[in-house]
A protein has these predicted regions:
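Ligand-binding "clamshell"
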Residues: 101-113, 128, 201, 206, ...
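Periplasmic-binding protein-like
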Residues: 148-157, 247, 255-276
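Extracytoplasmic "Venus flytrap"
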Residues: 29, 34-58, 74-79
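A conserved helix-loop-strand patch within extracytoplasmic ligand-binding domains
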Residues: 113-162, 261
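A bilobed periplasmic-binding-protein/Venus flytrap-type ligand-binding module shared by bacterial periplasmic
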Residues: 120-131, 233-247
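C-terminal motif of bacterial Sec signal peptides marking the signal peptidase cleavage site
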Residues: 18-22
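Short helix-initiation/N-cap motifs at beta->coil->alpha
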Residues: 70-81, 169-197
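Bacterial signal peptide processing site
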Residues: 24-27
Length: 277
């Protein structure tokens, strides 16, 4: 298996993103036509999706005659701008709600190509070990990004701890939508990456799936799993103009192939992942 890896420096790519933002990424010159390309460059943020792609998808693409290059990023905006500009062909790291948020913010036109297996967000106990131990004033952390905060609130509603007004756009959600909090839960949004390290300091936390895996938590210890809405299932992201290209269709077919599904379901590394319908 031949995979070329490039670590993309945040400083350099951030400067690019800022320049695109200033003039509108959507207003830049379109990338050269890449309809018949045989080398596919895919970007990843830290998380489980790169391993899944390299071990489960790349062999299929190579059998189809493609060479694959990997670029590693650490920023969700930069990696999307890189797709829009054509610096990379695709990224695999986000759900459509976040993708649309970045599209609107950056003035770009990326699209979801195919849903991929995605780990559930889950509720974990910190100082408390069961749902029954919830008490007046219990402390709960949720992700601080609006869309993932909304997912956290959905779990808290599913276990009967709160109620809130549904929103049409999860990217607008904040704690002000809560309408009923009978336990007077002290709900605090915090950075995703801090949820597992801070778990010992709070009673409960709703933790995003990739941070569950990266933080060494076990889904068997989760107190509740989200009923994952489709819009929060991660996707392969490409430029809208590339959706029908042969290389994009090859990626889509690989993710839908029986070989890949067998790879995921037989691999303990991907326990807790939801398969696309």
């Amino acid at each position: 298996m031949k995979i070329t890896r490039v670590l993309t420096a945040v400083a350099a790519t951030s400067a690019l993103a800022l320049s695109l933002t200033a003039c509108g990424a959507g207003g830049t010159a379109a990338p050269e036509d890449n309809t018949d390309k045989k080398t596919i460059t895919v970007g990843f943020n830290p998380g489980p999706y790169q391993q899944m792609f390299e071990e489960g998808i790349v062999p299929i693409l190579e059998e189809d005659g493609f060479e694959v290059k990997i670029e590693e990023f650490t920023d969700g905006i930069v990696i999307n701008v890189a797709v829009a500009q054509g610096d990379i062909d695709a990224n695999i790291m986000q759900h459509p709600v976040y993708m649309e948020f970045v599209n609107a913010q950056e003035g770009i036109d990326n699209a979801g190509l195919v849903q991929i297996p995605t780990p559930n967000m889950a509720l974990f106990g910190g100082k408390k070990s069961t749902l029954d131990e919830v008490a007046d004033g219990s402390t709960v952390t949720v992700p601080d990004s609006p869309a993932n905060l909304y997912r956290g609130l959905l779990i808290l509603r599913e276990v009967g701890w709160i109620d809130f007004e549904d929103v049409d756009d999860p990217n607008t959600a904040d704690l002000s939508i809560i309408t009923d909090n009978p336990h007077n839960l002290q709900i605090t949004p915090i950075e995703n990456a801090q949820q597992v390290p801070s778990l010992q300091d709070v009673d409960y936390s709703t933790v995003q799936g990739n941070f569950i895996l990266a933080g060494g938590l076990d889904y068997a210890d989760a107190l509740a799993l989200e009923n994952q809405p489709t819009e929060f299932s991660n996707v392969v992201t490409v430029r809208s103009a590339d959706l029908e290209t042969p290389w994009a269709k090859a990626i889509e077919a690989a993710y839908k192939s029986p070989e890949f599904i067998e790879f995921v379901t037989s691999n303990d590394d991907f326990d807790g992942f939801n398969l696309p319908e």
